[in-house]
Design a protein with these regions (language model features):
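Charged, glycine-interspersed solvent-exposed loop segments at helix/strand-loop junctions
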Residues: 190, 194-293, 447-529, 533-534, ...
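Intrinsic disorder and flexible/low-complexity segments
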Residues: 325-328, 332-368, 489, 561-622
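Cysteine-centered motifs
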Residues: 10-12
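Cleft-lining beta-strand/loop regions that shape enzyme active-site pockets
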Residues: 60, 67-190, 199, 321-449, ...
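C-terminal long alpha-helix characteristic of the crotonase
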Residues: 249-250, 282-327, 440, 498-504, ...
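Flexible, low-complexity junctional segments that flank or bridge functional domains
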Residues: 22-70, 79, 113, 118, ...
Length: 622
């Protein structure tokens, strides 16, 4: 209670008290009313949804001859989206704001194999990606679609850079008369809060191993360290060069020419006709002309309707999937690695890898005699070292019974690499971010604020020297001695990490240390230093798993089940609930610009006494 009160005082110090309290009660009242209404109508919606589930289970999309699959490059795309509500279909909702990479790739493959689907239309150009490798995998799937001899047409009012990278695979790219392409190269700025904390009297203390382990720097420095600049420059240049090469091949221009366009001018403000001259697009076109272009490809009259299929439609198209042969399990582990998902949801975090839950799932796969091999799909920048070790141990036990092949997604770094290292074989996408072999602990000390500025002092008794070490760390004036023990604890954790990688990858500990030190690596570079075995896709990982298990005929099943949309509302001991995430939204609106630093404080207070195996905190491209 005392520490909670002190955190409240911290918040009051950095905000205007009257405004905060007024807004708090207003929003609390609105939240209570919203929850009451939610409880009243839930029963009604559940009834309708159950009827919708029955209807959707018994029906599938019928594909008409001469159809077009429309993929809208808007919203966001991530590793795996949660199951949608049956109400979507009943209410005629055909837009999916968050797209699962697994879903869209599955739909593209269905379209490739379906004779009635003649092509794909990519509409829009502002799709957000959780990682560079996610965009690369979507583009690769579209590239594979074209091998069937079918066409792809793309059109947008404007193209964000990474969406253009995806769309560049199309046979023809069209742009609105007043459209723009935001081609400018990769880059961005990171926030550093030390100056703010200095003014508040808050000091962050870091215990870490790894000169490249930069996660702590946003709280301990006022600018980027040379080591962090080095690693960020390396992986961003690698990703950008890969994107340039792919775009240049598709658009039949030189990569150097594209780079020059991004380097010499702000393409977002260019005249659309300049894009045609630069061969970035094929034609400046008005929206109503798109249909005419597609009808020409379909060889239908201008008055005929185009049979369109959305992503939702394609997901409901029956697959020609063959369930014969042995089973290979594909287990998805994506998001931050946590001990409990409740805290993550309260802070507005996305999907998480819960240590205990994931370890239990992997043990079940180990005991399932029907599963002959496992592909462990990892897309994580790490998190709790304790949870990471739980999962790693489960992977090791699984490997003792059947082959385990890791398929790395957008990132498999720090804790993500920790849980990957015991596998028989590691396959990574060319633009996967991996490595980050390092450990840290991060503790905020509030004595400068609470004692020096607010006048709160502390006194007490104890039976032993360090009985109150946790309070001394956070509120004491001289926590240096305790931090020495904290550093020793982190040092041991790093040595454990080195041993884990050494045993898993067959590399000497000294060599692991030389390529470790918290440094992130692009997968194409990680291949050269033996952190991964092959650059390839999830399909390549499945083929390798079948090879190791000596399977001639096999089929794949995905785990864990996505669960129904109803599950999102139900509280769980480890996973939290929908209402938890709603509380986060209320606090974010209340705190405004102060939300990020205060949530950082909250998280480090919660996790600071534990080792963290977490990579640098922002690897998105835009």
């Amino acid at each position: 209670m005392r520490f909670t009160f002190l955190l409240y005082l911290c918040s009051c110090y950095v905000t205007i008290n009257h405004f905060i309290m007024k807004q708090f009660f207003k929003m609390t009242f609105a939240t209570v009313c919203g929850i009451a209404i939610f409880l009243v109508v839930t029963g009604f919606f559940l009834t309708i949804s159950l009827l919708g589930m029955v209807a959707s289970d018994s029906a599938s999309t019928k594909v008409k001859d001469n159809s077009v699959f429309v993929i809208k490059l808007n919203g966001n795309i991530e590793e795996r989206a949660s199951a949608g509500s049956p109400l979507d279909e009943l209410l005629g909702v055909d837009e999916i704001s968050t797209i699962g990479l697994d879903d869209v790739i599955s739909a593209i493959r269905k379209a490739k194999d379906n004779e009635d689907i003649k092509g794909i239309y990519l509409e829009g150009g502002s799709l957000g990606f959780d990682a560079p490798a996610t965009a690369q995998q979507l583009r690769d799937a579209l590239k594979d679609f074209k091998k069937s001899g079918k066409w792809i047409v793309a059109s947008a009012n404007q193209y964000h850079q990474v969406s253009y990278y995806v769309a560049s695979v199309a046979d023809n790219i069209y742009l609105n008369d007043h459209g723009a392409i935001d081609l400018r190269g990769l880059g961005g700025k990171r926030e550093y809060y030390k100056g703010l904390y200095d003014k508040l009297g808050i000091k962050y203390m870091a215990a870490k191993v790894g000169k490249y382990k930069s996660y702590v720097e946003s709280n301990t420095l006022t600018g980027m360290s040379d080591y962090d600049r080095e690693q960020r420059t390396a992986y961003q240049n690698g990703i950008w060069n890969y994107m340039l090469k792919e775009m240049a091949e598709s658009r039949k221009v030189k990569a150097e020419a594209l780079n020059q366009l991004a380097n010499d001018s702000i393409m977002a403000f260019a005249d659309p006709n300049d894009y045609v001259k630069a061969r970035l697009i094929d034609k400046v076109i008005f929206p109503e002309e798109i249909k005419a272009e597609i009808k020409k490809r379909l060889k239908i009259d201008k008055d005929d309707d185009i049979h369109q299929l959305t992503l939702s439609d394609m997901l409901n198209v029956k697959s020609e999937k063959d369930d014969d042969g042995d089973k290979i399990a594909i287990y998805y582990a994506y998001g931050s690695i946590v001990d409990s998902e409740t805290i993550n949801k309260l802070q507005g975090g996305g999907h998480s890898i819960v240590g205990k839950t994931t370890a239990e799932d992997l043990r079940k796969l180990a005991d399932d005699d029907d599963v002959k091999a496992v592909v462990f799909r990892v897309n994580s920048g790490g998190g709790s070292a304790v949870a990471s070790e739980q999962i790693r141990h489960a992977v090791k036990l699984l490997k003792a019974k059947k082959p385990v092949v890791v398929s790395m997604g957008g990132a498999a770094a720090s804790g993500g690499y920790w849980i990957s290292s015991p596998a028989n074989y590691i396959v990574a996408e060319p633009t996967t971010i991996t490595g980050s072999i390092g450990i840290f602990g991060l503790i905020p000390n509030f004595s400068g604020l609470v004692t020096d500025k607010l006048g709160v002092t502390f006194d007490g008794v104890k039976t032993n020297k360090f009985s109150d070490y946790d309070e001394e760390l956070i509120l004491g004036k001289n926590p240096d001695e305790i931090m020495k023990y904290m550093q020793t604890y982190v040092d041991k954790g790093y040595q454990q990490f080195l041993t884990i990688v050494s045993e898993g990858r067959g590399i000497k500990p000294a060599e692991v240390d030389s390529i470790g030190q918290g440094r992130v690596w692009l997968a194409s570079d990680a291949l050269k230093i033996k952190l991964v075995d092959k650059l390839g896709s999830l399909d390549d990982a499945v083929k390798k798993a079948a090879e190791l298990a000596k399977l001639k005929e096999y089929h794949c099943e995905t785990y864990p089940n996505k669960g129904s949309w109803i599950d999102q509302f139900m509280p769980d001991e480890d996973k939290g609930s929908y209402l938890d995430s709603q509380l986060h939204k209320e606090f974010k609106a209340l705190l405004g610009d102060l939300y990020e630093p205060l949530m950082e404080i909250r998280q480090t207070v919660k996790e600071g006494s534990r080792m963290q195996a977490r990579m640098l905190d922002d690897v998105r491209v835009k």
